[in-house]
Amino acid sequence: MLKNILKILIIFLFGMAGGIFAGQILWPYYIERPLAPVIEKKEIIIQENTVLQEAVKKVEKSVVGIRIKTAGGKIITGSGIIVTTDGLIVTLSELLPKAGDFAFFIDGKTVVEYQILKRDQKTNLVLLKVKAEKDDLQTSGFAPFEEIKLGERVFLMGVIFPESEPIKMVNEGIVKYLTEDYIRTNIFENNTLTGSPLFNIKGELLGLNIIDSQGRVTAIPITQIRQFIGL
């Protein structure tokens, strides 16, 4: 009988000691030292999202919406990019017919005074100049073509007209492959975003987007654009 009591007492004492050790030493230790990898992963995701949001905000006012009514009554919509603060805009030649009613949407304002300065069917680029308030004409920087990397994170921004009113739209992806003549992304989009600029995550211009019949987004590279506009 005495032996059983001693056994119970010893078990009780060991249990108390284990409880004190866990409560006073182990538990505070794990509270003070949380699982760092999980927190680091969350911080990386938050930082990446913040970088994209900042880049979008940086380039938003440089993106131009284009809406044309042709002589035959057809409506054509697309986008372009402001390249100088005196009103130079570059977009795709296929967007601008030689005749029609043209309207350019810049930072929420409609501009109808313009002049086509240069057109190149081979590169599918057109340069025009609009008359607008200088404060409304904001530009983005040009990305160095030689620094573009496979797998690099990129985004496009364009203007769509779902109900005749312009709305800016963003989509993101990566550089799938590239040559001197084009940059292929993994982005798929509607052809209403034809002419939309492609940017890197710094908000620098990489090219202007052509969207094929399957929705694949391919950009005319910045090297061809700069050579065409002379900048």
Predicted stretch roles:
Residues 84-165, 182-183, 214:
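Conserved active-site neighborhood of the chymotrypsin/trypsin-like protease fold
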Residues 15-43, 48-52, 56, 135-139, ...:
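C-terminal cap/linker of serine protease catalytic domains
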Residues 80, 112-115, 173, 196:
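Small-residue-enriched segments and motifs
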